[in-house]
Amino acid sequence: MQITYFAGGCFWCVEAIFQRIEGVVKLTSGYCNGNTVDPTYQDICTGTTGHAEVVKVEFYELKVSFKTLLNIFFEIHNPTTKNQQGNDRGTQYRSAIFYTNDEQQSQAIDMVNQMSDKIVTQIIKLDVFYPAENYHQNYFNNNSSQPYCQMLIAPKLNKYFNQ
């Protein structure tokens, strides 16, 4: 099993997509790197902690390759906008891949270099990960009728899985 971390705006959106990918066995929303120990969501929302909202993705490489996960990641968010995804703005919403081994780093760099657009996605070695509060875990599945889910996450799911 391998682990990687994707930051592509609000972690609820990223989590909802990857939950539906065969070979992904566990997801945990949380916060990567930054300068505050064990931050809360309220801390992150200030935009001053240096953390990114991320989803920790645990996957079986024999069922889904890291390259496939990278392709999905780049399809489900805009990697050309700095510190913003839609109306979510701030460094906590930046596009980043927090890799856990040299092969992930190499594949991520290769993929970015092959893209024609100017990509702002950061490719950073994971330093530290803090799980988000429980109410952030499995958010879309537990709150699919909430307005944010209906307006942003559901259309993203429909677009990705019905193309």
Curated annotation (Swiss-Prot):
It is an enzyme of class 1 (oxidoreductase). GO terms for molecular function: L-methionine:thioredoxin-disulfide S-oxidoreductase activity; peptide-methionine (S)-S-oxide reductase activity. It comes from the Bacteria. InterPro entries: Met_Sox_Rdtase_MsrA_dom (IPR002569), Met_Sox_Rdtase_MsrA_sf (IPR036509). The keyword Transit peptide does not apply. Keywords: Oxidoreductase. The active site is at C10. SUPFAM superfamilies: Peptide methionine sulfoxide reductase (SSF55068). The keyword Oxidoreductase applies. It catalyses: L-methionyl-[protein] + [thioredoxin]-disulfide + H2O = L-methionyl-(S)-S-oxide-[protein] + [thioredoxin]-dithiol; [thioredoxin]-disulfide + L-methionine + H2O = L-methionine (S)-S-oxide + [thioredoxin]-dithiol. Its EC number is 1.8.4.11. It holds the Pfam family PMSR. Has an important function as a repair enzyme for proteins that have been inactivated by oxidation. Catalyzes the reversible oxidation-reduction of methionine sulfoxide in proteins to methionine. NCBIfam families: msrA. This is Peptide methionine sulfoxide reductase MsrA. The gene is msrA.
